[in-house]
């Protein structure tokens, strides 16, 4: 135990030259119990003679007593070390005591006499108090709880603790005091029945000290005091080990409040811990950097490595994690008080103004940096906290309209999705990815569902399909067909065909295209430069399916805890509920009087009615299987529809009651605060307006997302990574409304903006028009794909390298107890997936961009070939630390795709259409990548497509869009780095390799070629879109299975 080592070390190091203190204390042959007892008594006798002096003690007197106490502590340590059990004075019936020195200490009240003398030592009081604390620390650590039951030990201990309140001690004395308090908390946690020993009336205690002549008269209004907790409060915000030990002890006290209501009442009503924690948290937040230094082009969130590198952020996160732990373990009164103080004293007055920053004067760039830092801090907070109470407070903060003059924080965040600044846009999308990962009902309602529930964005003829999932609909094929033609052609060339296999292609064969052979960048073994890529997830549909199944199941579990089930229903207009109920009652009376069992007959007639082809629309409603009046044909029997609606209305009313009754038992922070009836009648307008078709809005959030998606080919690569990841996050929700919007190709959408499927078709047409299927286009696609795959393995290798770091080991030790088993299951699952991907042969490609001698090359291929030949002739390459050759053309190709060549030749600083900045430099500074490590419990998936998602939580790396996208988690909270991933500085292209001058000239020619920059952007977009569509196809397939299963259980 570290406590025992600390106490032993402390005793051994505080001596004044005594020889016994330097010798081993566990050698049984070195000490005679009788001799130890005699020596102990002799030392006390000499010390007591000094104590009995009537004059104030001098310096020599204090040194003498401290020296004797030093020897006494050593003798006690020797005795206790060899005693298996501490013998108490009252327990000795016969025979010699097992611990005679300890018995003498208690029977003669040595501790009480020592305390009384220490109060008279004046300026030497701290030195004497230090020796006393060492003595108590020794006895508590070795005797556990037995001595606390005896007054000769407990009484002077309470006295010295009470006298320490409000005092300012030197560091060594503070350290000993906090260690002693920590030990007492551990003992009390194991022996809760001793808690009342440390509750004493301050009035009684002070009066008792007045009788001894020690302190001034007490103040009026003194109450019961928990002395241990009171002494720990001043150290709650201390740095270093002292603060950590104090916070650990305070958490033990908070946990004790769950077992003893007196502790909880005292902390909540009489202590100042809650306002102290909140004010300290606000002060630490104010010390955070106003702008974060962004060292890479793809930076989008704060990682654990960033926290350790910024001391102010480390202190803030320590305080935040302590507040989260207090809410987790404390008494309900303490928890509620802390949450109220957090919301009123930190979240609203501190975070609110920091996030709602606006442009002021000429400080636009500074303001953008401040917004980025504030949103990054909010994202870090949401990923770090785990308690539902705190999460509920932050959700309330995002949706509050009263605290900020009618402006909601959530609306301000949505507006920043349209920001032209790439960094602000990526940080905003990363924040929304964290928010969507919370699976919170209120957030989803405000962002999406309240705009989709009326169903006005779907034509009337298609609305019956929203809740009804067709098991034979192949949405996966729809998404695969949206892949750009150049990507389809590349797949056809990469697919090894059998001799007897007919060639089926929807493309017109081009005579100039090469023969259908496999490219070196396709398959599971892209190892042209010696990099093992057998575990590549590129184009691994099994990995996509596994990831989709895992994510959808996780999301479904959380959504089952919601208060409302969000399915499309046609609700009555305002004020029509009573009219409909009255009409139904009249119909019931009519059929009961004249019908003679009409209900059963009507149910049979309804089944026959639903079987008609022309009236199939009404059968699609899952909630109400009756035909609304405004959708019925004139030939429909009104009586049948009315009777059927009555039966189903009663059924749905009972189902709604059961849902609302069970919602109180679910996680409150995930569930909505709105009652369903209030939501329907007050917040949402479900009236049917046929003239509103084509002008219905899906809400500002989806409009912003669709707007960004429409500029897909002009966005930067990293913005597109986060954008596709965010849409994929939405596609994981197993809700029919969201499923019909994103993954249903058979449902038309009529809104004021193009639908998701329409935008995808437009992007396909744009890429097909600007990047036709030619040999040069296939070469560019091949190079783009190779660079993305290479980055996937570079990130994977960086993760493996980080796994060997001490920081990673410490983090893994903390996560091992919670996620070891789950990680093992995921690794085995992915090992199966990797094994299922066979290693393929890679025959030479006729359009291989790495081939050095081919006279048929045109445009880009000629430039690459000449570049390679000049590179080989120069023979000036060096070998980088990662083992890949710097003389290879890979770094130059990466520079070609990142625009670094123009920088290397000294071009002016510019910013391309995708938002990538190019600095004016001759050293060649290029973009760096962001390495991330997978969170516990989250699989690594996505081929070159993994999402930029967090967890959190709970946030994790396994997700949607490319492995190039970076992410961290959590909440629970993953480790990543924002600097160079190859062990060197964060400079260079994708491979962080230096470029030579002769290669610079070649790259300058390529970069200046007309259309080259646009072509490379389109190539990256095509590869990204192709992989994203594969992932959407996998999600659509898994969602259909989940929703069809759910539909069958209704």
From Swiss-Prot:
Keywords: Phosphoprotein. Belongs to the FHIP family. Residues 800-827, 865-888, 911-954, 968-995 are annotated as: Disordered. Residues 872-888, 941-954 have a biased composition (Low complexity). This is FHIP family protein GE18198. Disulfide bonds: none annotated. Residues 808-826, 918-935, 968-977 have a biased composition (Polar residues). The keyword Nucleotide-binding does not apply. The modification Phosphoserine is found at residues 498, 805. Pfam families: DUF5917, KELAA, RAI16-like.
């Amino acid at each position: 135990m570290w406590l025992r080592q600390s106490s032993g070390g402390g005793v051994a190091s505080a001596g004044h030259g005594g020889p016994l203190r330097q010798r081993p204390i566990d050698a049984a042959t070195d000490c005679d119990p009788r001799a130890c007892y005699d020596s102990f008594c002799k030392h006390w006798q000499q010390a007591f003679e000094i104590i009995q002096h009537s004059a104030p003690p001098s310096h020599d007197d204090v040194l003498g007593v401290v020296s004797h106490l030093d020897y006494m502590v050593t003798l006690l340590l020797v005795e206790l070390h060899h005693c298996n059990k501490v013998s108490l004075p009252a327990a000795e019936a016969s025979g010699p005591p097992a611990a005679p020195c300890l018995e003498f200490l208690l029977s003669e009240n040595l501790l009480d006499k020592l305390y009384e003398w220490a109060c008279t030592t004046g300026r030497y009081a701290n030195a004497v108090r230090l020796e006393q604390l060492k003595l108590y620390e020794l006895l508590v650590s070795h005797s556990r709880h037995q001595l606390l039951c005896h007054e000769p030990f407990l009484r002077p201990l309470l006295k010295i603790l009470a006298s320490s309140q409000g005092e300012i001690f030197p560091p060594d004395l503070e350290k000993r005091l906090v260690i002693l308090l920590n030990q007492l908390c551990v003992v009390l946690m194991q022996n809760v029945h001793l808690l009342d020993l440390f509750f004493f009336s301050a009035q009684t205690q002070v009066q008792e000290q007045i009788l001894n002549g020690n302190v001034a008269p007490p103040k009026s209004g003194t109450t019961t005091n928990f002395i241990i907790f009171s002494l720990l409060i001043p150290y709650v915000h201390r740095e270093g080990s002292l603060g950590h030990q104090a916070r650990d002890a305070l958490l033990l006290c908070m946990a004790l409040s769950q077992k003893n209501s007196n502790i909880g009442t005292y902390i909540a009503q009489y202590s100042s811990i809650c306002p102290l924690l909140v004010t300290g948290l606000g002060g630490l937040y104010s010390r955070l950097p106003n702008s974060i230094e962004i060292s890479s082009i793809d930076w989008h969130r704060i990682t654990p490595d960033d926290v350790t590198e910024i001391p102010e952020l480390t202190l803030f996160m320590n305080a935040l994690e302590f507040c989260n732990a207090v809410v987790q373990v404390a008494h309900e009164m303490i928890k509620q008080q802390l949450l109220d103080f957090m919301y009123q004293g930190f979240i609203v007055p501190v975070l609110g103004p920091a996030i709602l920053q606006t442009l002021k004067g000429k400080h636009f760039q500074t303001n953008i940096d401040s917004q980025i830092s504030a949103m990054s801090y909010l994202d870090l907070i949401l990923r770090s906290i785990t308690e539902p109470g705190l999460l509920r407070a932050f959700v309330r903060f995002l949706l509050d309209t009263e605290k900020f003059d009618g402006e909601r924080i959530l609306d301000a965040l949505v507006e920043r999705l349209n920001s032209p600044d790439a960094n602000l846009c990526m940080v905003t999308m990363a924040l929304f990815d964290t928010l969507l990962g919370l699976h919170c009902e209120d957030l989803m309602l405000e962002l999406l569902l309240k705009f989709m529930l009326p169903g006005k964005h779907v034509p009337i003829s298609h609305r019956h399909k929203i809740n009804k999932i067709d098991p034979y609909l192949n949405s996966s094929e729809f998404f695969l067909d949206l892949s750009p033609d150049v990507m389809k052609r590349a797949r056809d060339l990469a697919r090894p065909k059998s001799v007897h296999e007919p060639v089926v292609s929807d493309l017109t064969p081009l005579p100039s295209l090469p023969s259908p052979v496999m490219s070196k960048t396709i398959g599971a073994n892209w190892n042209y430069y010696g990099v093992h890529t057998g575990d590549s997830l590129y184009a691994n549909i099994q990995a996509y399916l596994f990831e989709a199944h895992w994510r959808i199941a996780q999301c479904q579990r959380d959504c089952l805890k919601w208060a409302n089930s969000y399915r499309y229903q046609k609700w009555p207009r305002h004020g029509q509920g009573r009219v409909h109920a009255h009409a139904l009652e009249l119909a019931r009376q009519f059929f009961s009087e004249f019908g003679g069992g009409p209900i059963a007959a009507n149910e049979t007639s309804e089944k026959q009615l639903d079987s008609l082809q022309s009236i199939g629309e009404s059968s699609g409603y899952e909630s109400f299987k009756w035909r609304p009046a405004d959708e019925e044909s004139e030939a429909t029997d009104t009586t049948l529809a009315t009777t059927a609606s009555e039966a189903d209305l009663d059924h749905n009313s009972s189902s709604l009651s059961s849902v609302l009754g069970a919602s109180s038992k679910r996680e409150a922070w995930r569930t909505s605060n709105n009652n369903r009836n209030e939501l329907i009648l007050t917040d949402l307008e479900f009236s049917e307006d046929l003239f509103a078709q084509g002008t219905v809005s899906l809400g500002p959030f989806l409009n912003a997302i669709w707007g960004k998606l429409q500029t897909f080919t002009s966005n930067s690569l990293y913005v597109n990574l986060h954008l596709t990841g965010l849409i994929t996050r939405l596609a994981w929700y197993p809700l029919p409304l969201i499923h019909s919007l994103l993954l249903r190709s058979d449902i038309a959408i009529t809104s004021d903006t193009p639908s998701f499927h329409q935008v995808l078709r437009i992007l396909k047409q744009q890429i097909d028009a600007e990047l036709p299927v030619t040999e040069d286009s296939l070469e560019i696609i091949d190079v783009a794909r190779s660079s993305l795959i290479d980055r996937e393995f570079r990130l994977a290798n960086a993760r493996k390298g980080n796994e060997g770091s001490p920081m990673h080991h410490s983090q893994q030790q903390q996560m091992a107890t919670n996620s070891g088993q789950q990680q093992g299951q995921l690794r085995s699952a992915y090992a199966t997936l990797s094994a299922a991907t066979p290693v393929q042969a890679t025959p030479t490609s006729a359009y291989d961009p790495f081939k050095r001698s081919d006279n048929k090359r045109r445009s880009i291929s000629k430039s690459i070939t000449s570049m390679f030949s000049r590179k080989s002739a120069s023979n000036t390459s060096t070998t980088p630390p990662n083992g890949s050759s710097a003389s290879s053309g890979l770094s130059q190709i990466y520079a070609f795709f990142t625009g670094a060549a123009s920088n290397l030749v000294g071009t002016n600083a510019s910013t391309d259409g995708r938002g990538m900045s190019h600095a004016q430099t001759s050293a060649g500074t290029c973009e760096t990548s962001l390495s991330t490590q997978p969170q516990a419990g989250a699989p690594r998936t996505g081929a070159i497509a993994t999402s930029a998602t967090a967890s959190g939580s709970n946030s994790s790396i396994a997700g949607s869009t490319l492995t190039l996208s970076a992410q961290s988690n959590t909440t629970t909270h993953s480790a990543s780095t924002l600097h160079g991933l190859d062990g060197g500085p964060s400079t260079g292209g994708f491979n962080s390799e230096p470029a030579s001058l002769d290669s610079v000239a070649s790259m300058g020619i390529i970069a200046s070629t007309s259309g080259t920059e646009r072509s490379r952007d389109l190539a990256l977009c095509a590869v990204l879109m192709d992989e994203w569509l594969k992932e959407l196809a996998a999600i659509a397939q898994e969602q259909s299975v989940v929703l069809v299963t759910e539909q069958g259980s209704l």
